[in-house]
Amino acid sequence: MFSKSYQITKEMYEARGWQIIKEDELTILAKVNSRENTNPEFAIAKFIKTTQEIKSPPLSQIIDFSSNEYVCVTIICDGSITTNVKKIEQTTKGKVEIFHNKDLQMNITKYHLQPLFNKLLDEEAKDFKKKYIKCKIENGKKIILQSFPSMSKSDPIARFFKYQSGDVIKITNKDGFVSYRIVK
C-alpha cells in the first residue's frame, strides 16, 4: 500500500540532507545533520492507514510530540486528511508534517524539466536580503519598499525540502538561468 510513498519519503529525507539510520515496514528513522546544533537530532516518518490513528493512543505512545528528540515527525496517511488533522501541523509549529499517500507517488524533484532548488546558508541569505530587499521603518513598522518573488510554504517543493518562512531559495533552471525566491 505504501511501497511507492515509502521510497519517495526516503528520497525526500535524503534530499534534505538527512541520513537514514533505521527503517522497517512502517517507519523510517533519520539523523538530521544540523550546522547549528551539535547534539544529535532525529526525524521519524510513520506510515498509517487512517487518520483516526493520528489521534489514537498508540501513535502518541510511539511518538511523544512534545519531546525534543525529534525535530521532524512526518506522517504519511492513506485516509482523508481532515481539518482537525491539519491543526496538528499548525499547533506543532512545523515539527509535524502530514502528507497524503497519493502526494508521494512521484519524486517531483526528479522530473526532467524541474529546476534545481538550493537554500542559501543563513549568512548568505542575510547578505542577499540586505542587498536586494529595500525597506524602511515608519512609526515603528517595517515597510518593504521593494517586493521580491516569493514561494509559499505550502508549495510542493517547499514541503518536499521543508523550507521555512524567510528562507531564501536559489533556483537554477536547466538552461543555467538563476532566480531567487523567499519562502512566505
UniProtKB/Swiss-Prot annotation:
InterPro entries: Arch_Rpo5/euc_Rpb5, RNA_pol_subH/Rpb5_C, RPB5-like_sf. Keywords: DNA-directed RNA polymerase, Nucleotidyltransferase, Transcription, Transferase. It comes from the Viruses. Belongs to the archaeal Rpo5/eukaryotic RPB5 RNA polymerase subunit family. The keyword DNA repair does not apply. Gene3D superfamilies: RPB5-like RNA polymerase subunit (3.90.940.20). GO terms for biological process: transcription by RNA polymerase II; transcription elongation by RNA polymerase I; tRNA transcription by RNA polymerase III. GO terms for cellular component: DNA-directed RNA polymerase complex. PANTHER family: DNA-DIRECTED RNA POLYMERASES I, II, AND III SUBUNIT RPABC1. The keyword Hydrolase does not apply. This is Putative DNA-directed RNA polymerase subunit 454R.
